[in-house]
Amino acid sequence: MSAIQAAWPSGTECIAKYNFHGTAEQDLPFCKGDVLTIVAVTKDPNWYKAKNKVGREGIIPANYVQKREGVKAGTKLSLMPWFHGKITREQAERLLYPPETGLFLVRESTNYPGDYTLCVSCEGKVEHYRIMYHASKLSIDEEVYFENLMQLVEHYTTDADGLCTRLIKPKVMEGTVAAQDEFYRSGWALNMKELKLLQTIGKGEFGDVMLGDYRGNKVAVKCIKNDATAQAFLAEASVMTQLRHSNLVQLLGVIVEEKGGLYIVTEYMAKGSLVDYLRSRGRSVLGGDCLLKFSLDVCEAMEYLEGNNFVHRDLAARNVLVSEDNVAKVSDFGLTKEASSTQDTGKLPVKWTAPEALREKKFSTKSDVWSFGILLWEIYSFGRVPYPRIPLKDVVPRVEKGYKMDAPDGCPPAVYEVMKNCWHLDAATRPTFLQLREQLEHIKTHELHL
């Protein structure tokens, strides 16, 4: 086996591990944390030609940067890798063997349901401390109270504060990976000190979306404070590390705070959601070229997801954002999964979801195609809610009997044909996104959209 690392191909993204001031004129200086893109290999394998975010090119040392990788699919990321759930006192003691002072884990309490137990190895034996849950706060001594388990563990890591020892080494639950370690390893961890949060631009059930500044660039930041919700959003962030396309909202990085906060930092989309953009401008402002361009933007993003075996599951105009220069980009990867998995259908948007996905939880690229047809209808109706004048409870029974919405007012017949093809009840007869893109490009070339 050769120990020589394979050369990074052109287009590879790297993140700087150290500052590099450059010594020669052809060098490209950079700061720790900068993202650089490889342009070409040089004769010397220790140096690459690269460019920075403003397009300046130069030579960089390979050992000063690390390649950015996607977080591996299937990696079980955890904000609390030391949390072992429902295990018994005896199981906890076996896990903390051989004894090592400061080795710890947290489990659910068996004697006091709803409470937790902190188990710590100390001078050859294991101590079990009950963590009481009272008035939405956690405490061991009823003197110091914490919002969540992460804050509690962080406190006792810095100071024993009455315990037999401070917490030194987490006993990681088998099969899980500490989220911060994994984002750092793969080059996606950002530095909180360099992020300025400026103003709230959206509120969700999970937390706020804020306009921020990261190293002089405008960014959007999802701020998730609740540890359980943050855990769910880790999956979204790890999917985003694997995806890169000009019509997908780009992840810039992730910040995992010791106290349990999670910040997902993405490019800032100045003109907001496509549905609001359409409603606020309407027919008098947006012509046929503009509507078809948005349709193609989304289709190209979905063709990329299709080619990479990802299913979005929540495609709708509310989950497409518009940039300063009027490019539509697909966002909200909260439900995006590798194509093979199934999902609970409790919270699915009925009017956008394919019948087989609602009925049998069968999600596939073809169920995304159904949703794309609905999204086309939203675009050409300037942001109307689909199935107007039909009560929500009646939508699925009517659709399953073959009902299809009429064309929106003024919708070109060729575009309406594309919509209807997306709404075949038999998923297998729906077109692929590649075919849809070709159909939309044909419409554009022959000016059938005007």
Curated annotation (Swiss-Prot):
Q: Which domain of life is it from?
A: Eukaryota
Q: Show the CDD domains listed in the entry.
A: PTKc_Csk, SH2_csk_like, SH3_CSK
Tell me which GO cellular component terms the UniProt record holds: cell-cell junction; cytoplasm; plasma membrane
Q: Which UniProt keywords apply?
A: Acetylation, Adaptive immunity, ATP-binding, Cell membrane, Cytoplasm, Immunity, Kinase, Magnesium, Manganese, Membrane, Metal-binding, Nucleotide-binding, Phosphoprotein, SH2 domain, SH3 domain, Transferase, Tyrosine-protein kinase
Q: Where are the active-site residues found?
A: D314 (proton acceptor)
The protein's matches in InterPro entries, at most eight in alphabetical order, are given as: Csk-like_SH2 (IPR035027), Kinase-like_dom_sf (IPR011009), Non-receptor_tyrosine_kinases (IPR050198), Prot_kinase_dom (IPR000719), Protein_kinase_ATP_BS (IPR017441), Ser-Thr/Tyr_kinase_cat_dom (IPR001245), SH2 (IPR000980), SH2_dom_sf (IPR036860)
**One MF term in GO for this entry?**
protein kinase A catalytic subunit binding
Has the keyword Metal-binding been applied to this entry? yes
User: What happens without the gene?
Assistant: Mice die between day 9 and day 10 of gestation with several defects including a non-functional neural tube. SRC and FYN kinases show increased activity when CSK is missing.
What are its E.C. numbers?
Answer: 2.7.10.2
Tell me the cofactors it needs.
Mg(2+); Mn(2+)
Q: Phosphotyrosine modification sites?
A: Y184, Y304, Y416
Q: What SUPFAM superfamilies does the record tag this protein with? A: Protein kinase-like (PK-like), SH2 domain, SH3-domain
Please describe the quaternary structure of this protein: Homodimer (via SH3-domain). Interacts with PTPN22. Interacts with phosphorylated SIT1, PAG1, LIME1 and TGFB1I1; these interactions serve to recruit CSK to the membrane where it can phosphorylate and inhibit Src-family kinases. Interacts with SRCIN1. Interacts with RHOH. Interacts (via SH2 domain) with SCIMP; this interaction is dependent on phosphorylation of SCIMP 'Tyr-96'. Interacts (via SH2 domain) with PRAG1 (when phosphorylated at 'Tyr-391'); this interaction prevents translocation of CSK from the cytoplasm to the membrane leading to increased activity of CSK. Interacts with LRRK1.
Identify this protein by name: Tyrosine-protein kinase CSK
> Which species is the source of this protein?
Mus musculus (Mouse)
User: What gene name does this entry carry?
Assistant: Csk
